[in-house]
Amino acid sequence: MKKTTIALAVIAAALTIGPQVATAGTLDDVKSRGVLRCVVSTGVPGFAYPDASGAWKGFDIDFCRATAAAVLGDASKIKAVTSTGKTRFTKLNAGEGDVLWRNTTITFSRDVGVKLRFHGVNYYDGQGFLVKKALGVKSAKELNGASVCIQTGTTTELNLADYFHANGMKYEAVTIETNDEARQNYTSGRCDVYTTDASGLAATRSTFSDPQNHIVLPEIISKEPLGPATRHGDDQWSDIVTWVLNATITAEEKGITQANVDKMKSSKDPEVLRLLGVEGSQGKELGLSNDWAYNIIKSVGNYGEIFERNIGVNTPIGLPRGLNALWTKGGLQYSPPFR
């Protein structure tokens, strides 16, 4: 009887300890390693791409850098773990990366079935179609019989099938795995159409020698809320990634920028003081230093600065804010309060 009681007590203790160890795992691993590993795309202009020197840049990369700034105090301490649409979740769940900052749509099956935890939307998007002007097409409903470049392992693959079926059309699928492969097949004429998120189409078109000869058709056929993800089972790490994104949005709401963040430490706005770590203990509650959000803004800026620098109207990508404007300016970007 005593042996049975002891055995049950040991099992109960093990079950109690287990989750606590898992919860602290990723943060401790990143701090010990001194480098944050971000699962990113193989290369999408404006979002995640290596420059001439091999340094990774872009919208998603800046959010990776923001996370490193929050956790390690140094935005440069990152490693880009490249992935295709097929391999991105496998690499994250296998522990090859710490967080996924990649053009990835939040869906029920990915959240529940693939065992990912999503942390808000850093880009509101939708699926579109890119065609050559010479094709003479003005609407996606004129694409019956077209050959279409489509990336495998993506929501766009399923959306395409649904859209053509619903409109009584047929198509030839030209399957590809990377954006570069799609670009090559599209420009060579192997496919008449390239379909993916509209932001990705704008990014791809910006790399053409004759972008004016290509158009994105007016139809947007899906909702594609893109956001960061982590593995299930690590609540502390989930909280950190969630509030990294929220910090950049709140900073824009409050008018805090890379240029004025030091001055804003003397603000009379209590929420600004909490965000920048002048007051409160929010950094400690996350397991970070109290200046974690200050480090983000000082290193990469607020959400608007990240957007405009990488993909905004004054870049080759040329994307307007649209749905990604702040809620106070007609958009959907909105952060819960820092309270």
For each feature predicted by the language model, list its residue ranges.
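Extended ligand-binding regions for polar small-molecule ligands
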Residues: D62-R65, A69-V71, A134-V137, K141, ...
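Cleavable N-terminal signal peptides
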Residues: V10-A12, A22, V30
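C-terminal functional modules
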Residues: G280-R339
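Sec/Tat signal peptide C-region and signal peptidase I cleavage site
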Residues: I17-A24
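Bacterial N-terminal signal peptides that target proteins for export
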Residues: M1-L8
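Extracytoplasmic small-molecule ligand-binding "clamshell" domains
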Residues: A24-G25, K31-W101, L286-D291, I296-S299, ...
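Acidic, polar ligand-binding/catalytic clefts
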Residues: R65, A69, G73, K77-E142, ...
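Bilobed "Venus flytrap"/periplasmic-binding protein-like clamshell domains
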Residues: R37-G46, W56-V71, T105-I106, D125-E181
